């Protein structure tokens, strides 16, 4: 459960492409009206936030137009993230999934 929603389907390494562009999405979670785009990084850097928002998120509808009516959410799954980078991601609407021992902590984006 993320952003208060249950996701029913999980797909890994999904490739969307057109003649001019191609993108691989690490994890896509789906339910009937929402898609959660999750990029997986060992350690998150500030440029990863821009890549997720501008390139991966920005190209999503172009590459996978069948989901144009779905509400889109962005997330970063990581082992390590500095506090300043974490706050930037949250402020920009990205949910963080961070491993803490055997558990995954979910840090929701700022409302």
Where are these regions (language model features)?
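Short amphipathic alpha-helical surface micro-motifs
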Residues: 20, 55-59, 77-79
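Residue-level detector of flexible, active-site-proximal loop/helix-junction positions
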Residues: 16-17, 44, 81, 103
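Domain-level recognition of nuclease-like catalytic cores that cleave nucleotide substrates
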Residues: 72-111
């Amino acid at each position: 459960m993320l952003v208060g929603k249950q996701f029913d389907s999980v797909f890994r390494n999904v490739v969307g492409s057109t003649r001019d562009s191609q993108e691989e999405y690490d994890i896509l979670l789906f339910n009937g009206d929402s898609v959660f785009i999750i990029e997986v990084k060992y350690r998150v850097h500030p440029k990863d936030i821009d890549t997720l928002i501008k390139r991966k998120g920005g190209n999503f509808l172009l590459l996978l137009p069948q989901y144009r009516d779905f509400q889109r959410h962005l997330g970063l799954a990581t082992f390590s993230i500095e506090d300043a980078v974490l706050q930037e991601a949250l402020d920009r609407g990205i949910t963080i999934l961070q491993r803490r021992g055997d558990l995954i902590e979910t840090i929701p984006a700022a409302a």
